[in-house]
Amino acid sequence: MRWFINYKPCLLIILIFNSVILLFILIRKSSQPFSNILTDPSGTSREKLPVSHAFINSVYYYPTSKSLGENALAFTMAIDQHSYSMKNHTFTVLGYNSTDSVESIATSQTEGISRCRYVTMMARTNTVENLEKLKIESQGVSVEVPFRIARYSAPKPVIICISPQFAAEQWQMFVMHVHAANRFGGHLHIYLTSIIESYFQLMQEYERQGYITLDYWLRMKFSNTKTPYYEPNENVEWRHQAGAQTDCLLQYKEAAEYIAFFDMDDILFPKNYPTYLEEFNSVLAANPGKNYLFYGRREHEFVKASTLTEFSFTELVQSLRSSQTVKRGKVVVRPEAYNSTWIHNSKHVSFETSVQVKSPTLVHVQLPVDKNGKRNDSRDLWKIKFGPLNETIREDDIRAIEDDINRIKNLAVISSIGPFLPSSDFYLPIVFKCYFDSFYKDTFVTKIGVRRCPNADICDLPQREDYKCIHSDAQYYSGPDMQPVTYHFTTDSFWSKDIGCYQ
Protein backbone atom coordinates (compact mmCIF):
# COMPACT_ATOMS: atom_id res chain seq x y z
CA MET A 1 0.00 0.00 0.00
CA ARG A 2 2.84 2.39 0.82
CA TRP A 3 4.47 1.73 -2.60
CA PHE A 4 1.12 2.43 -4.38
CA ILE A 5 0.64 5.75 -2.55
CA ASN A 6 4.15 6.94 -3.52
CA TYR A 7 3.58 6.00 -7.16
CA LYS A 8 0.56 8.28 -7.64
CA PRO A 9 2.64 11.50 -7.77
CA CYS A 10 4.92 9.84 -10.31
CA LEU A 11 1.98 8.96 -12.56
CA LEU A 12 0.69 12.52 -12.26
CA ILE A 13 4.07 14.00 -13.16
CA ILE A 14 4.39 11.70 -16.19
CA LEU A 15 0.87 12.59 -17.32
CA ILE A 16 1.54 16.32 -17.02
CA PHE A 17 4.89 15.98 -18.81
CA ASN A 18 3.33 14.07 -21.73
CA SER A 19 0.50 16.60 -21.98
CA VAL A 20 2.99 19.48 -22.17
CA ILE A 21 4.96 17.69 -24.89
CA LEU A 22 1.79 17.00 -26.90
CA LEU A 23 0.66 20.61 -26.53
CA PHE A 24 4.09 21.82 -27.67
CA ILE A 25 3.91 19.61 -30.78
CA LEU A 26 0.42 20.85 -31.63
CA ILE A 27 1.45 24.50 -31.22
CA ARG A 28 4.56 23.94 -33.33
CA LYS A 29 2.54 22.28 -36.11
CA SER A 30 -0.05 25.03 -36.09
CA SER A 31 2.67 27.68 -36.41
CA GLN A 32 4.21 26.03 -39.46
CA PRO A 33 3.01 27.27 -42.87
CA PHE A 34 0.26 25.13 -44.34
CA SER A 35 0.57 24.43 -48.03
CA ASN A 36 -2.54 25.27 -50.02
CA ILE A 37 -1.07 23.97 -53.28
CA LEU A 38 -3.22 21.39 -55.04
CA THR A 39 -1.83 18.94 -57.57
CA ASP A 40 -3.40 17.80 -60.82
CA PRO A 41 -1.16 15.25 -62.58
CA SER A 42 -3.71 14.85 -65.37
CA GLY A 43 -3.72 18.57 -66.13
CA THR A 44 -7.46 18.40 -66.78
CA SER A 45 -9.14 19.38 -63.48
CA ARG A 46 -12.02 21.85 -63.66
CA GLU A 47 -12.54 21.91 -59.88
CA LYS A 48 -14.04 25.15 -58.60
CA LEU A 49 -12.12 26.61 -55.67
CA PRO A 50 -13.35 29.29 -53.24
CA VAL A 51 -11.08 31.92 -54.83
CA SER A 52 -9.49 32.52 -58.21
CA HIS A 53 -5.83 33.41 -57.75
CA ALA A 54 -4.13 35.82 -60.15
CA PHE A 55 -0.46 36.56 -60.75
CA ILE A 56 0.00 40.11 -62.03
CA ASN A 57 2.90 40.31 -64.49
CA SER A 58 2.71 44.04 -65.15
CA VAL A 59 0.60 47.17 -64.99
CA TYR A 60 1.28 50.05 -67.40
CA TYR A 61 0.08 53.62 -67.04
CA TYR A 62 -0.42 55.73 -70.17
CA PRO A 63 -0.81 59.49 -69.63
CA THR A 64 -2.02 59.46 -73.25
CA SER A 65 -2.76 56.58 -75.61
CA LYS A 66 -3.97 56.46 -79.20
CA SER A 67 -6.09 53.39 -78.54
CA LEU A 68 -6.66 53.30 -74.78
CA GLY A 69 -7.44 56.97 -74.11
CA GLU A 70 -6.21 59.47 -71.52
CA ASN A 71 -4.73 58.28 -68.22
CA ALA A 72 -5.17 54.67 -69.23
CA LEU A 73 -4.14 51.57 -67.31
CA ALA A 74 -3.39 48.15 -68.80
CA PHE A 75 -2.92 45.02 -66.68
CA THR A 76 -1.36 41.70 -67.73
CA MET A 77 -1.92 38.68 -65.50
CA ALA A 78 -2.40 34.94 -65.37
CA ILE A 79 -5.69 34.13 -63.67
CA ASP A 80 -7.62 31.00 -62.65
CA GLN A 81 -10.53 30.82 -65.09
CA HIS A 82 -12.08 27.60 -63.75
CA SER A 83 -12.90 28.61 -60.17
CA TYR A 84 -14.74 31.69 -61.42
CA SER A 85 -15.63 32.40 -65.02
CA MET A 86 -13.38 35.12 -66.42
CA LYS A 87 -15.55 35.87 -69.43
CA ASN A 88 -16.20 39.64 -69.38
CA HIS A 89 -14.67 39.81 -65.89
CA THR A 90 -14.51 43.26 -64.29
CA PHE A 91 -12.88 44.62 -61.15
CA THR A 92 -12.67 47.91 -59.26
CA VAL A 93 -9.56 50.08 -59.57
CA LEU A 94 -8.68 52.99 -57.29
CA GLY A 95 -6.22 55.56 -58.63
CA TYR A 96 -4.64 58.30 -56.50
CA ASN A 97 -2.52 61.38 -57.08
CA SER A 98 -1.43 63.98 -54.52
CA THR A 99 -4.82 65.72 -54.46
CA ASP A 100 -7.45 63.42 -55.90
CA SER A 101 -8.64 59.84 -56.31
CA VAL A 102 -10.75 58.11 -58.95
CA GLU A 103 -12.65 54.84 -58.75
CA SER A 104 -13.13 53.04 -62.06
CA ILE A 105 -14.13 49.64 -63.40
CA ALA A 106 -11.56 47.64 -65.37
CA THR A 107 -12.88 45.49 -68.19
CA SER A 108 -10.94 42.50 -69.42
CA GLN A 109 -10.28 40.07 -72.23
CA THR A 110 -8.49 36.73 -72.12
CA GLU A 111 -6.13 34.98 -74.52
CA GLY A 112 -5.44 31.28 -74.64
CA ILE A 113 -7.31 28.01 -74.51
CA SER A 114 -10.11 26.91 -72.21
CA ARG A 115 -8.51 23.68 -70.99
CA CYS A 116 -5.74 25.51 -69.11
CA ARG A 117 -6.75 26.58 -65.61
CA TYR A 118 -4.69 29.77 -65.76
CA VAL A 119 -5.33 32.01 -68.74
CA THR A 120 -3.69 35.25 -69.90
CA MET A 121 -5.82 38.26 -69.06
CA MET A 122 -5.43 41.84 -70.24
CA ALA A 123 -7.56 44.37 -68.35
CA ARG A 124 -7.97 48.08 -69.01
CA THR A 125 -9.48 51.17 -67.47
CA ASN A 126 -8.89 54.91 -67.17
CA THR A 127 -7.93 56.64 -63.97
CA VAL A 128 -6.78 59.86 -62.34
CA GLU A 129 -4.16 62.03 -64.06
CA ASN A 130 -0.60 62.06 -62.74
CA LEU A 131 -1.15 58.68 -61.13
CA GLU A 132 0.90 58.07 -57.98
CA LYS A 133 -0.75 55.09 -56.28
CA LEU A 134 -2.88 52.24 -57.58
CA LYS A 135 -5.16 49.76 -55.80
CA ILE A 136 -7.49 46.93 -56.75
CA GLU A 137 -10.57 46.72 -54.52
CA SER A 138 -13.20 44.05 -53.94
CA GLN A 139 -15.92 43.86 -51.28
CA GLY A 140 -14.23 46.45 -49.08
CA VAL A 141 -10.77 44.84 -49.23
CA SER A 142 -8.01 46.37 -51.36
CA VAL A 143 -4.42 45.75 -52.35
CA GLU A 144 -1.90 48.27 -53.65
CA VAL A 145 -0.13 47.07 -56.79
CA PRO A 146 2.96 48.49 -58.52
CA PHE A 147 2.78 50.08 -61.97
CA ARG A 148 5.12 51.53 -64.59
CA ILE A 149 4.73 54.26 -67.17
CA ALA A 150 4.55 52.73 -70.64
CA ARG A 151 7.29 53.49 -73.15
CA TYR A 152 6.87 56.49 -75.45
CA SER A 153 10.06 55.94 -77.43
CA ALA A 154 11.60 52.81 -78.93
CA PRO A 155 15.14 52.01 -80.12
CA LYS A 156 13.78 51.09 -83.58
CA PRO A 157 10.38 51.51 -85.26
CA VAL A 158 9.98 47.71 -85.36
CA ILE A 159 10.11 45.82 -82.06
CA ILE A 160 10.48 42.03 -82.17
CA CYS A 161 9.18 40.46 -78.96
CA ILE A 162 11.05 37.20 -78.33
CA SER A 163 9.16 34.58 -76.32
CA PRO A 164 10.60 33.61 -72.90
CA GLN A 165 13.87 31.70 -73.02
CA PHE A 166 14.69 29.01 -70.45
CA ALA A 167 17.79 26.83 -70.14
CA ALA A 168 18.90 28.89 -73.13
CA GLU A 169 22.12 27.74 -74.77
CA GLN A 170 21.64 28.22 -78.54
CA TRP A 171 23.75 31.34 -78.89
CA GLN A 172 24.24 30.67 -82.62
CA MET A 173 20.52 31.29 -83.28
CA PHE A 174 20.72 34.48 -81.25
CA VAL A 175 23.72 35.83 -83.19
CA MET A 176 21.99 34.98 -86.46
CA HIS A 177 18.73 36.62 -85.41
CA VAL A 178 20.04 39.73 -83.69
CA HIS A 179 22.27 40.78 -86.60
CA ALA A 180 19.59 40.06 -89.20
CA ALA A 181 17.06 42.10 -87.23
CA ASN A 182 19.52 44.95 -86.80
CA ARG A 183 20.25 44.99 -90.54
CA PHE A 184 16.55 45.33 -91.35
CA GLY A 185 15.70 47.91 -88.69
CA GLY A 186 14.37 45.66 -85.93
CA HIS A 187 15.11 45.62 -82.21
CA LEU A 188 14.83 42.43 -80.15
CA HIS A 189 13.05 42.58 -76.78
CA ILE A 190 14.05 39.28 -75.13
CA TYR A 191 12.37 37.71 -72.11
CA LEU A 192 14.63 35.49 -70.01
CA THR A 193 13.75 32.91 -67.39
CA SER A 194 17.07 31.03 -67.33
CA ILE A 195 20.15 31.06 -69.53
CA ILE A 196 23.72 29.71 -69.57
CA GLU A 197 25.88 32.32 -67.81
CA SER A 198 28.34 32.95 -70.66
CA TYR A 199 25.45 33.28 -73.13
CA PHE A 200 23.84 35.77 -70.74
CA GLN A 201 27.05 37.78 -70.66
CA LEU A 202 27.04 37.80 -74.47
CA MET A 203 23.47 39.11 -74.49
CA GLN A 204 24.32 41.76 -71.92
CA GLU A 205 27.05 43.13 -74.19
CA TYR A 206 24.64 43.21 -77.12
CA GLU A 207 22.26 45.15 -74.89
CA ARG A 208 25.02 47.64 -74.08
CA GLN A 209 25.66 47.96 -77.81
CA GLY A 210 21.97 48.84 -78.37
CA TYR A 211 20.91 45.74 -80.32
CA ILE A 212 18.50 44.27 -77.77
CA THR A 213 16.59 44.88 -74.55
CA LEU A 214 16.62 42.15 -71.90
CA ASP A 215 13.61 41.63 -69.68
CA TYR A 216 12.69 39.30 -66.82
CA TRP A 217 10.16 36.53 -67.26
CA LEU A 218 9.51 35.32 -63.75
CA ARG A 219 8.30 32.02 -62.46
CA MET A 220 4.89 32.57 -60.88
CA LYS A 221 4.76 32.15 -57.10
CA PHE A 222 2.08 32.85 -54.52
CA SER A 223 4.03 33.81 -51.43
CA ASN A 224 1.21 33.71 -48.88
CA THR A 225 -2.27 32.29 -49.40
CA LYS A 226 -5.18 31.47 -47.12
CA THR A 227 -7.15 29.59 -49.76
CA PRO A 228 -6.20 26.59 -51.94
CA TYR A 229 -4.90 26.95 -55.48
CA TYR A 230 -3.42 24.87 -58.27
CA GLU A 231 0.26 25.47 -59.00
CA PRO A 232 0.18 28.14 -61.73
CA ASN A 233 3.30 27.21 -63.71
CA GLU A 234 2.03 23.65 -64.23
CA ASN A 235 -1.41 24.81 -65.32
CA VAL A 236 -0.76 27.63 -67.77
CA GLU A 237 -0.15 27.33 -71.50
CA TRP A 238 3.56 27.11 -72.40
CA ARG A 239 5.15 29.12 -69.58
CA HIS A 240 2.52 31.86 -69.95
CA GLN A 241 4.06 32.84 -73.27
CA ALA A 242 0.95 34.79 -74.24
CA GLY A 243 1.46 36.86 -71.10
CA ALA A 244 5.00 37.79 -72.11
CA GLN A 245 3.89 38.76 -75.60
CA THR A 246 1.00 40.81 -74.24
CA ASP A 247 3.37 42.51 -71.80
CA CYS A 248 5.71 43.39 -74.67
CA LEU A 249 2.81 44.74 -76.73
CA LEU A 250 1.64 46.94 -73.87
CA GLN A 251 5.18 48.19 -73.14
CA TYR A 252 5.69 49.46 -76.70
CA LYS A 253 2.07 50.22 -77.62
CA GLU A 254 2.71 53.97 -77.91
CA ALA A 255 6.35 53.72 -79.00
CA ALA A 256 6.65 51.31 -81.94
CA GLU A 257 5.19 51.42 -85.43
CA TYR A 258 5.09 47.63 -85.67
CA ILE A 259 5.44 44.87 -83.09
CA ALA A 260 6.33 41.29 -84.09
CA PHE A 261 5.85 38.25 -81.87
CA PHE A 262 8.53 35.69 -82.76
CA ASP A 263 10.51 32.91 -81.15
CA MET A 264 14.30 33.11 -81.10
CA ASP A 265 14.43 30.57 -83.94
CA ASP A 266 11.99 32.54 -86.16
CA ILE A 267 13.93 34.86 -88.47
CA LEU A 268 12.37 37.09 -91.11
CA PHE A 269 14.27 38.23 -94.19
CA PRO A 270 12.30 40.94 -96.04
CA LYS A 271 11.85 40.09 -99.71
CA ASN A 272 11.01 43.30 -101.55
CA TYR A 273 12.36 46.18 -99.45
CA PRO A 274 15.57 46.87 -97.53
CA THR A 275 13.88 47.27 -94.13
CA TYR A 276 11.08 45.70 -92.15
CA LEU A 277 9.33 49.06 -91.86
CA GLU A 278 9.20 49.59 -95.62
CA GLU A 279 8.15 46.00 -96.24
CA PHE A 280 5.32 46.06 -93.70
CA ASN A 281 4.11 49.48 -94.85
CA SER A 282 4.06 48.26 -98.44
CA VAL A 283 2.06 45.13 -97.63
CA LEU A 284 -0.59 47.01 -95.66
CA ALA A 285 -0.77 49.84 -98.21
CA ALA A 286 -1.64 47.23 -100.83
CA ASN A 287 -4.36 45.81 -98.57
CA PRO A 288 -6.63 48.63 -97.33
CA GLY A 289 -8.53 47.85 -94.15
CA LYS A 290 -5.94 45.36 -92.90
CA ASN A 291 -3.94 46.02 -89.75
CA TYR A 292 -1.65 43.07 -89.18
CA LEU A 293 0.47 40.58 -91.11
CA PHE A 294 0.55 36.81 -90.68
CA TYR A 295 3.76 34.99 -91.68
CA GLY A 296 3.99 31.20 -91.94
CA ARG A 297 7.00 29.40 -90.44
CA ARG A 298 8.91 27.21 -92.86
CA GLU A 299 11.15 24.54 -91.34
CA HIS A 300 14.86 24.91 -92.15
CA GLU A 301 18.09 23.28 -91.15
CA PHE A 302 21.53 24.87 -91.02
CA VAL A 303 25.03 23.94 -89.97
CA LYS A 304 26.04 25.79 -86.84
CA ALA A 305 29.51 26.77 -85.72
CA SER A 306 30.77 25.31 -82.46
CA THR A 307 32.68 28.45 -81.45
CA LEU A 308 32.13 32.18 -81.85
CA THR A 309 35.51 32.52 -83.57
CA GLU A 310 34.46 30.26 -86.43
CA PHE A 311 30.92 31.63 -86.67
CA SER A 312 30.31 32.89 -90.22
CA PHE A 313 26.97 34.23 -91.38
CA THR A 314 27.97 33.62 -95.00
CA GLU A 315 28.66 29.94 -94.32
CA LEU A 316 25.49 29.67 -92.28
CA VAL A 317 23.35 30.96 -95.17
CA GLN A 318 25.15 28.65 -97.58
CA SER A 319 24.21 25.71 -95.35
CA LEU A 320 20.53 26.66 -95.04
CA ARG A 321 18.12 24.11 -96.51
CA SER A 322 14.36 24.51 -96.78
CA SER A 323 11.52 22.05 -96.31
CA GLN A 324 8.01 22.00 -97.70
CA THR A 325 6.66 22.06 -94.14
CA VAL A 326 5.11 25.41 -93.22
CA LYS A 327 3.77 25.50 -89.67
CA ARG A 328 1.29 27.81 -88.02
CA GLY A 329 2.68 31.30 -88.23
CA LYS A 330 3.35 34.41 -86.18
CA VAL A 331 2.05 37.95 -86.50
CA VAL A 332 3.38 41.46 -87.01
CA VAL A 333 0.87 44.05 -85.81
CA ARG A 334 0.16 47.73 -85.74
CA PRO A 335 0.07 48.21 -81.96
CA GLU A 336 -3.03 50.40 -81.98
CA ALA A 337 -4.97 47.46 -83.47
CA TYR A 338 -4.04 45.00 -80.71
CA ASN A 339 -4.56 45.19 -76.94
CA SER A 340 -3.54 41.61 -76.16
CA THR A 341 -2.27 38.58 -78.01
CA TRP A 342 -2.03 34.82 -77.85
CA ILE A 343 1.02 32.81 -79.00
CA HIS A 344 0.03 33.02 -82.67
CA ASN A 345 -2.51 35.86 -82.88
CA SER A 346 -5.24 37.55 -80.85
CA LYS A 347 -8.70 36.04 -80.73
CA HIS A 348 -10.05 39.56 -80.17
CA VAL A 349 -8.91 40.88 -83.55
CA SER A 350 -10.68 39.53 -86.59
CA PHE A 351 -8.61 37.27 -88.82
CA GLU A 352 -10.31 39.12 -91.68
CA THR A 353 -8.15 42.16 -90.91
CA SER A 354 -4.92 40.21 -91.43
CA VAL A 355 -2.79 39.85 -94.55
CA GLN A 356 -1.71 36.25 -95.11
CA VAL A 357 1.81 36.78 -96.44
CA LYS A 358 2.70 33.85 -98.72
CA SER A 359 6.28 34.90 -99.35
CA PRO A 360 8.58 35.34 -97.57
CA THR A 361 7.98 32.93 -94.72
CA LEU A 362 9.73 32.96 -91.38
CA VAL A 363 12.94 30.95 -91.50
CA HIS A 364 12.36 28.52 -88.63
CA VAL A 365 15.68 26.99 -87.52
CA GLN A 366 14.62 24.87 -84.57
CA LEU A 367 17.10 21.98 -84.80
CA PRO A 368 20.50 22.81 -86.33
CA VAL A 369 23.23 20.41 -87.44
CA ASP A 370 26.69 20.44 -85.86
CA LYS A 371 29.65 21.29 -88.10
CA ASN A 372 31.03 17.79 -87.65
CA GLY A 373 27.87 16.48 -89.30
CA LYS A 374 26.32 15.23 -86.06
CA ARG A 375 22.54 15.51 -86.22
CA ASN A 376 20.50 16.13 -83.13
CA ASP A 377 18.54 12.95 -82.38
CA SER A 378 15.47 15.06 -81.68
CA ARG A 379 15.28 15.82 -85.39
CA ASP A 380 14.18 12.25 -86.02
CA LEU A 381 10.99 12.91 -84.07
CA TRP A 382 9.85 15.17 -86.91
CA LYS A 383 9.72 13.45 -90.30
CA ILE A 384 10.81 16.48 -92.31
CA LYS A 385 12.77 16.42 -95.56
CA PHE A 386 15.01 19.31 -96.54
CA GLY A 387 16.06 20.55 -99.96
CA PRO A 388 17.51 23.70 -101.57
CA LEU A 389 16.91 27.06 -99.90
CA ASN A 390 13.79 28.70 -101.27
CA GLU A 391 13.89 31.98 -99.34
CA THR A 392 15.42 35.19 -100.69
CA ILE A 393 18.45 36.47 -98.76
CA ARG A 394 20.19 39.22 -100.72
CA GLU A 395 23.96 39.15 -101.21
CA ASP A 396 24.43 42.73 -100.04
CA ASP A 397 22.54 41.92 -96.84
CA ILE A 398 24.69 38.84 -96.25
CA ARG A 399 27.87 40.91 -96.61
CA ALA A 400 26.59 43.70 -94.37
CA ILE A 401 25.49 41.25 -91.66
CA GLU A 402 28.84 39.44 -91.85
CA ASP A 403 30.70 42.74 -91.44
CA ASP A 404 28.54 43.66 -88.46
CA ILE A 405 29.18 40.29 -86.81
CA ASN A 406 32.92 40.64 -87.34
CA ARG A 407 32.86 44.10 -85.78
CA ILE A 408 31.18 42.70 -82.67
CA LYS A 409 33.46 39.65 -82.54
CA ASN A 410 36.51 41.92 -82.52
CA LEU A 411 35.38 43.76 -79.40
CA ALA A 412 37.64 42.81 -76.49
CA VAL A 413 34.76 41.96 -74.17
CA ILE A 414 33.15 39.68 -76.77
CA SER A 415 36.47 37.98 -77.48
CA SER A 416 36.82 37.21 -73.77
CA ILE A 417 33.31 35.69 -73.58
CA GLY A 418 33.58 33.57 -76.74
CA PRO A 419 35.70 30.69 -75.38
CA PHE A 420 33.18 30.04 -72.59
CA LEU A 421 30.10 29.68 -74.80
CA PRO A 422 28.75 26.10 -75.04
CA SER A 423 30.07 24.27 -78.11
CA SER A 424 27.45 21.50 -78.20
CA ASP A 425 23.81 20.93 -77.33
CA PHE A 426 22.80 19.75 -73.91
CA TYR A 427 19.40 21.18 -72.96
CA LEU A 428 17.94 21.48 -76.47
CA PRO A 429 17.37 17.74 -77.08
CA ILE A 430 16.07 17.25 -73.53
CA VAL A 431 13.57 20.08 -73.83
CA PHE A 432 12.55 19.15 -77.37
CA LYS A 433 11.90 15.52 -76.39
CA CYS A 434 9.87 16.58 -73.37
CA TYR A 435 7.77 19.00 -75.44
CA PHE A 436 7.30 16.36 -78.12
CA ASP A 437 6.16 13.71 -75.65
CA SER A 438 3.86 16.03 -73.72
CA PHE A 439 2.12 17.68 -76.67
CA TYR A 440 3.48 17.63 -80.21
CA LYS A 441 3.50 13.86 -80.70
CA ASP A 442 -0.21 13.37 -80.08
CA THR A 443 -1.12 16.64 -81.77
CA PHE A 444 0.82 16.36 -85.02
CA VAL A 445 2.07 12.76 -85.35
CA THR A 446 -0.50 10.36 -83.88
CA LYS A 447 -3.16 13.09 -84.13
CA ILE A 448 -5.17 11.60 -81.27
CA GLY A 449 -5.20 14.99 -79.56
CA VAL A 450 -4.13 16.18 -76.12
CA ARG A 451 -6.75 16.76 -73.43
CA ARG A 452 -4.43 18.39 -70.93
CA CYS A 453 -3.18 21.97 -70.88
CA PRO A 454 -0.18 22.34 -73.26
CA ASN A 455 2.58 22.58 -70.71
CA ALA A 456 5.95 21.00 -70.03
CA ASP A 457 6.73 22.38 -66.59
CA ILE A 458 7.37 18.84 -65.38
CA CYS A 459 10.35 18.48 -67.73
CA ASP A 460 13.33 17.19 -65.77
CA LEU A 461 16.26 19.51 -66.48
CA PRO A 462 19.52 18.12 -65.06
CA GLN A 463 21.92 20.69 -63.70
CA ARG A 464 25.49 20.95 -64.96
CA GLU A 465 28.72 21.61 -63.15
CA ASP A 466 30.49 22.99 -66.23
CA TYR A 467 27.78 25.45 -67.32
CA LYS A 468 25.86 27.38 -64.69
CA CYS A 469 22.69 29.35 -65.36
CA ILE A 470 21.44 32.82 -64.60
CA HIS A 471 17.77 32.80 -63.56
CA SER A 472 15.28 35.64 -63.19
CA ASP A 473 14.03 36.34 -59.67
CA ALA A 474 12.20 39.03 -57.72
CA GLN A 475 10.56 39.95 -54.43
CA TYR A 476 7.21 38.15 -54.34
CA TYR A 477 4.11 39.50 -52.61
CA SER A 478 0.58 38.27 -51.98
CA GLY A 479 -2.30 40.61 -51.37
CA PRO A 480 -4.89 40.02 -48.64
CA ASP A 481 -7.51 37.32 -49.04
CA MET A 482 -10.01 38.80 -51.52
CA GLN A 483 -13.16 37.51 -53.20
CA PRO A 484 -13.58 36.47 -55.97
CA VAL A 485 -9.91 37.06 -56.91
CA THR A 486 -6.80 37.23 -54.74
CA TYR A 487 -3.84 38.98 -56.36
CA HIS A 488 -0.12 38.23 -56.27
CA PHE A 489 2.70 40.31 -57.76
CA THR A 490 6.41 41.11 -57.66
CA THR A 491 8.79 44.03 -57.30
CA ASP A 492 12.54 44.54 -57.64
CA SER A 493 13.35 41.90 -60.27
CA PHE A 494 16.97 40.76 -60.47
CA TRP A 495 19.24 38.14 -62.06
CA SER A 496 20.20 35.29 -59.73
CA LYS A 497 23.07 32.79 -59.88
CA ASP A 498 21.55 30.65 -57.12
CA ILE A 499 18.54 28.98 -58.77
CA GLY A 500 19.80 27.02 -61.76
CA CYS A 501 18.71 26.07 -65.28
CA TYR A 502 14.99 25.67 -64.78
CA GLN A 503 11.77 26.90 -66.33
From Swiss-Prot:
- Membrane-protein topology: Single-pass membrane protein
Please tell me where this protein is predominantly located. Answer: membrane
Q: Which Pfam families match?
A: Glyco_transf_92
InterPro entries, from UniProt? Glyco_transf_92, GTase_92
- In short, the EC number is 2.4.1.-
Keyword Transmembrane helix applies: yes
- Enumerate the spans annotated as GT92 domain: 156-441
Q: What subcellular locations does the record give?
A: Membrane
GO MF terms held by the record: glycosyltransferase activity
Enzyme kind, highest EC tier: transferase
One Gene Ontology term, aspect cellular component: membrane
Please list every transmembrane segment annotated in the UniProt record, as residue ranges: 7-27
Keyword terms of this UniProt record: Glycosyltransferase, Membrane, Transferase, Transmembrane, Transmembrane helix
Concerning its family, UniProt says: Belongs to the glycosyltransferase 92 family.
Protein name (record): Glycosyltransferase family 92 protein ZK381.2
Protein source organism? Caenorhabditis elegans
